[in-house]
Amino acid sequence: MPPSAAKQMGASTGVHAGVTDSSAFTRKDVADRPDLTIVGDSVYDAKAFRSEHPGGAHFVSLFGGRDATEAFMEYHRRAWPKSRMSRFHVGSLASTEEPVAADEGYLQLCARIAKMVPSVSSGFAPASYWVKAGLILGSAIALEAYMLYAGKRLLPSIVLGWLFALIGLNIQHDANHGALSKSASVNLALGLCQDWIGGSMILWLQEHVVMHHLHTNDVDKDPDQKAHGALRLKPTDAWSPMHWLQHLYLLPGETMYAFKLLFLDISELVMWRWEGEPISKLAGYLFMPSLLLKLTFWARFVALPLYLAPSVHTAVCIAATVMTGSFYLAFFFFISHNFEGVASVGPDGSITSMTRGASFLKRQAETSSNVGGPLLATLNGGLNYQIEHHLFPRVHHGFYPRLAPLVKAELEARGIEYKHYPTIWSNLASTLRHMYALGRRPRSKAE
């Protein structure tokens, strides 16, 4: 169990005790102080600021002890308001450290797309969205309740798994990116739908917001690029003879994401980390609620049905729901970041196709791909427009089809590749060819 933020930081009510405005911090200094965060070349009091953050305290808390430069830029689509944040300023990044700079090209693109987002919504969910969300959530709750009363059936259990996936794609995803509503409370409440369908909001935020979005396809930092030997996803992965067949067992293997939801989440929660990356101690106040919600899911979705109808059939139906939802989610996320020509990101001197020094705009666009059009976007929460989503995660998915032509033109004008597959099949075929190529034994330097 993680120590509470209060215990970790002592009884002091702020970081200013013993700290002057001229203090210089190394990145290690900040990493050891979860009450601090870095933006650009400055260090700020994250603990003091989080309660005033309009988007919710949990977002700021997750970046305690971290560099939030690109996170702020990506979620607010503007330059850091240094003068407004001066009262939270506690020092500067040491001269020995290289600050992360805002991507001016990205901010220029943000200014262009701002003109295409209706001012009445400011990029949050339009009124029509709430009808869709209500239908999906209501259908899932009604179907689950019906099967508790009438008993589990295999086909309805599969349908329920699909509805769980739609909740993940259409509701919790936008909510946990802060894209549904200007109200942090609304986003937080609907973000907890991740716990309702068997996941964990706090683990999702750590995996997706803190790690994946800022380090997409980074060979060391993106948790979605770690398959622990089961798959060879990137050129830096060690090769095994089993990888000859990875393009064949990839799709069946995606159903195994279910076991992550059922088992791995609990151990990661207890260890307060994701894929070895610690969750900020500043977010420690979310530990107990997150653990209780995980146990509540087990009680509601696993223990209660088995208590009411103890049988192998009931267990199979429970597994069918979780595996169906897991497969649907994993399938679309996987094909959007693993395809022919996709960039892999690594440090200078690595064998990756892109270095971490590339612009934010280029790193996000060339590690993602789009598929299909507005119809699939309506069904899948706009995540078939993965490029637009990675560039503008706090813009509601309903706007992505409208933004896509401008984004494509802007990126191509800057010499940045924009990959859009017309069909799911064409995207899948590219993914399988990509996995086949990575599954071949790499040549040694002597060959």
From Swiss-Prot:
Keyword Membrane: yes
Annotated TM spans: 123-143, 154-174, 185-205, 244-264, 286-306, 315-335
EC number: 1.14.19.31
Topological relation to the membrane, as annotated: Multi-pass membrane protein
Molecular function terms from GO: metal ion binding; oxidoreductase activity, acting on paired donors, with oxidation of a pair of donors resulting in the reduction of molecular oxygen to two molecules of water
Motif segment (Histidine box-1): 173-177
Sequence motif Histidine box-2, residues: 208-213
Coiled-coil stretches: none
Binding positions for heme per the UniProt entry: 53, 76
Annotated localization: Membrane
Single GO cellular component term: membrane
PROSITE patterns linked to this entry: CYTOCHROME_B5_2
SUPFAM superfamilies the UniProt entry points to: Cytochrome b5-like heme/steroid binding domain
Record keywords: Electron transport, Fatty acid biosynthesis, Fatty acid metabolism, Heme, Iron, Lipid biosynthesis, Lipid metabolism, Membrane, Metal-binding, Oxidoreductase, Transmembrane, Transmembrane helix, Transport
Catalytic activity: a (7Z,10Z,13Z,16Z,19Z)-docosapentaenoyl-containing glycerolipid + 2 Fe(II)-[cytochrome b5] + O2 + 2 H(+) = a (4Z,7Z,10Z,13Z,16Z,19Z)-docosahexaenoyl-containing glycerolipid + 2 Fe(III)-[cytochrome b5] + 2 H2O; a (7Z,10Z,13Z,16Z)-docosatetraenoyl-containing glycerolipid + 2 Fe(II)-[cytochrome b5] + O2 + 2 H(+) = a (4Z,7Z,10Z,13Z,16Z)-docosapentaenoyl-containing glycerolipid + 2 Fe(III)-[cytochrome b5] + 2 H2O
Principal location: membrane
Domain Cytochrome b5 heme-binding: residue ranges: 36-94
Short sequence motif named Histidine box-3, residue ranges: 386-390
Necessary cofactors: Fe(2+)
GO biological process: long-chain fatty acid biosynthetic process; unsaturated fatty acid biosynthetic process
Family statement: Belongs to the fatty acid desaturase type 1 family.
Known role: Fatty acid desaturase that introduces a cis double bond at the 4-position in 22-carbon polyunsaturated fatty acids that contain a Delta(7) double bond, resulting in the production of delta-4 desaturated fatty acid docosahexanoic acid (DHA).
Domain notes: The cytochrome b5 heme-binding domain acts as the direct electron donor to the active site of the desaturase, and does not require an external cytochrome.
Protein name as annotated: Acyl-lipid (7-3)-desaturase
